[in-house]
């Protein structure tokens, strides 16, 4: 008897073999995996009539084409969600549900918010794997890292490429060894701008990040300042050594924390952009402030700007539950301290800053404390699955 996964795979393959659909999909880039047949199956299987599509900025140019194809082959109506989507934390199931959508399809990010936690609306994540020619990267690694042990990381789009890279080099005749670390609940090799694995510096010679831009790369650099970092940009096909001013960042953040120690009135910003503002984390911070006898108010904001915060002159220090990198990267642009939850815990003497790195564990299952999203204290309790019992009778 075929498993459910096998049955689904068969149905998706039948949809994918539709010659008309194949022709329609030619307008999309062939090396981008938008999983349109799987999405069509999902819409049909859930009998969804009104489907929300959410894209990051780099993929929204394909939104209209994908929407047209989905409507053509399922008869559903689609709505393209136009609010800015910075990352996996911005999945906006609340808005999609409030609009009466049956299904939300989120493109370009991993399942940071599990589908079982999007109550009241069906959910589909499409990672949009991007297939690239790895021959040049393989040559670069051979040329520059003979006899070295490397860690390779990336965003979710290039995770399959990391697996190919590891298989290529982890052979008996290769002097190069490649590891793919994992920071659960992320996929092996995946890094976010706020979450990355903490590595044993004695075991590795370098980190190689596959991808463009520096936001995700800087996360693992901040978390592992002792290890040299390199970036391979698959679009420019360049391998570069990358640097980060750890001393300046540390000076700025500790300076803000020291000012916060003396503050009496705090503003807690609960981010409302998608799922950024975790209510349990906000409540944990409120409890910490209450124990220290501090005054506070809660403010809901989708995006955080100095001009907006200046409208609250009575607040001495701000703490935002949205994105740690907003404080780390842009905190000096705000006239008053703008901390994120870990830094408030430091300011209130609930934890000390590690001497050799700055934590990037905001969504890690193994985070330092209950001021992070997936700390054990904040994880949704999953119901245990009931055992599936099959009773067979012996043929006489």
Curated annotation (Swiss-Prot):
GO cellular component: 2-(3-amino-3-carboxypropyl)histidine synthase complex
Region (Disordered): 372-396
Binding annotation for [4Fe-4S] cluster: 89, 194, 323
Cofactor: [4Fe-4S] cluster
GO molecular function terms listed in the Swiss-Prot or TrEMBL record: 2-(3-amino-3-carboxypropyl)histidine synthase activity; 4 iron, 4 sulfur cluster binding; metal ion binding
Reactions catalysed: L-histidyl-[translation elongation factor 2] + S-adenosyl-L-methionine = 2-[(3S)-amino-3-carboxypropyl]-L-histidyl-[translation elongation factor 2] + S-methyl-5'-thioadenosine + H(+)
Enzyme type, top EC level: transferase
Family according to the record: Belongs to the DPH1/DPH2 family. DPH1 subfamily.
Subunit structure: Component of the 2-(3-amino-3-carboxypropyl)histidine synthase complex composed of dph-1, dph-2, dph-3 and a NADH-dependent reductase.
Protein name, entry field: 2-(3-amino-3-carboxypropyl)histidine synthase subunit 1
Species this chain originates from: Caenorhabditis elegans
